Amino acid sequence: MGIMVGLPSPSGSEKDLQLNFGKNMTVQVEMRAPHLPAEWDLQSGIQLTWPHAGTDWAYMLKEVQECFVNIAREIAKRELLLIVTPEPEEVKKQIVATVNMDNVRFLRCETNDTWARDHGAITMIDTGNPSLLDFTFNGWGLKFASELDNLITGQAVKAGALKGQYIDCLDFVLEGGSIESDGMGTLLTTTECLLSPHRNGKLNQVEIEEYLKSTFHLQKVLWLDHGYLAGDDTDSHIDTLARFCSTDTIAYVKCDNTEDEHYEELHAMEEQLKTFRTLAGEPYRLLALPMADKVEEDGERLPATYANFLIMNDAILYPTYQQPDNDRKAGEVLQQAFPKHQVIGIDCRALIKQHGSLHCVTMQYPSGVIQ
């Protein structure tokens, strides 16, 4: 089955690219000026950076690899999957029985850790052509080793694992989990993370906003000043707190328990979200995700969150924590946000032991990047 491409007549300053994947599936791709896609825009595939014995997962390697296999299986049912690992042959043994190997690609590469969301390339699209922006990843503000992970994007482009124009942005520290795009020129982020002194400490908020607007061709940056999760290493990444689900919808973590340590900050975050406006000047439709019950490891509270879901072409993968009521409620909210998607829960209790979850270990790439 081939891919047939037809270009209709341009309309205004934009035109559409029609992709026909056989007789039953047609996708319209907007040929727009440079923009930062939304996560729900058409994807070619997802990156996972696989855990191995040289990572912080060594003490629970089998448990976390089982979680990665479950994520890989759901991805490869639907899209291409790029697995970054120093040991492709070993990973193949782990996944071959249950994962659609026709959709799996490997990049042999040394790695420090597994958080592809933060060391993966951030992709811009210009009239249908992808550009792969390679920012510095410095271990969330110099907290953890990152020298190998910081090289992955450059190696992936050089090896042809990622297709697109490589753009060196290594003079700026930025993690994918710290920004949310609506695909139309609005960015959602947190002051706690982007103003961290150990990231781009020489720049103030105005300068950082100007950099973001210039780099990503934005019209507006929405800064959340409130919201955090105990045990979080990222300085309040936005993908743990509030997520765009469409250009006018945001799903966010809501805490109803006044005795919970998060109550005041998450309530303040909710109130600030109510003040935000779309580019059309309208308030956002806000969908409240439940606050996960306390998850602890060795007496330490872990940053379990339902906001850390992954949007795919026809499915939503979201983390569950063996909390039946909360897991169910979160799935129902996400189904409301994405009525045409299949919503699939994946047990992420293993991931949260290293202070991350499902979205943190994945990075999606728009059409054409993974082939």
Model feature map: region roles:
Residues 21-371:
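The feature marks the mature, well-folded catalytic cores of soluble enzymes
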